[in-house]
Amino acid sequence: MFSFNLLTIVSSIVNLLALAWIIKRYFLGAIIRIMNERREKIEAAMKEAEKKLQEAEDLRKQREAQLAQARDEAAKIIKEAVDTAEKMKRDITAKAEEEAEKIIVKAHEIATAERKRVLETAKKEVLAFSRLIIKEFFKRFLPVEAEELLISQFAESLDSAIANIKSDNIEEVKFISPDNVSSQLKKKIEDKLRSLLPGNWKFIFDVDPSIGLGFKLFIGEFLIDHSLDYHLSQIYETIREVENI
């Protein structure tokens, strides 16, 4: 019995060793290779997974950065739009105020010009009407020689007006009346002027019906105006100043 058992054991060992050799010879290398390949695949898969995770993380960070940049750009665009709108509002307001100021100034200028035109027209009408009335008064209620008498009296009052005129370079003196006066009055006026203005100047007597009454005296470039129009204008300007027109 003991011999059988030993033989069986030895046989089993031999079989086991043979099986081990066969497994090692034909199967162990393949198994190890398969296991190595699986391990490498698993490692490669893990590395790929880690790579994908890193790429995903990078993409997430990149997207967050892009979103942050987009938010900043959007905020910048909104701020620029608000600033532009505010500037446009200020510019429009300033331009509107400037245009309004120009309109007011223009309206004031137009009103002033129109007022001046109306006053000038009224002045001309008043002067013309006053001249007509005074001329008609002279014709109806005063003798014919009254106008010459008036001119003569005006001429007699020339002393103070001519006193300050320098007569050194006077070449011409012109006396203008509304109507032709007598030669006697002309002589009287010329003598009066020559007594006041020394020198060899030329004397000219002229007629201008638009004067109305009185006379105009040109001594060189200097004018002594004793015409009806002049005195009526002075009265009119005085009235305007008093009434603060």
Swiss-Prot record:
This is ATP synthase subunit b. F(1)F(0) ATP synthase produces ATP from ADP in the presence of a proton or sodium gradient. F-type ATPases consist of two structural domains, F(1) containing the extramembraneous catalytic core and F(0) containing the membrane proton channel, linked together by a central stalk and a peripheral stalk. During catalysis, ATP synthesis in the catalytic domain of F(1) is coupled via a rotary mechanism of the central stalk subunits to proton translocation. It comes from Dictyoglomus thermophilum (strain ATCC 35947 / DSM 3960 / H-6-12). GO terms for cellular component: plasma membrane; proton-transporting ATP synthase complex. Keywords: ATP synthesis, Cell inner membrane, Cell membrane, CF(0), Hydrogen ion transport, Ion transport, Membrane, Transmembrane, Transmembrane helix, Transport. Pfam families: ATP-synt_B. Belongs to the ATPase B chain family. It is found in: Cell inner membrane. CDD domains: ATP-synt_Fo_b (cd06503).
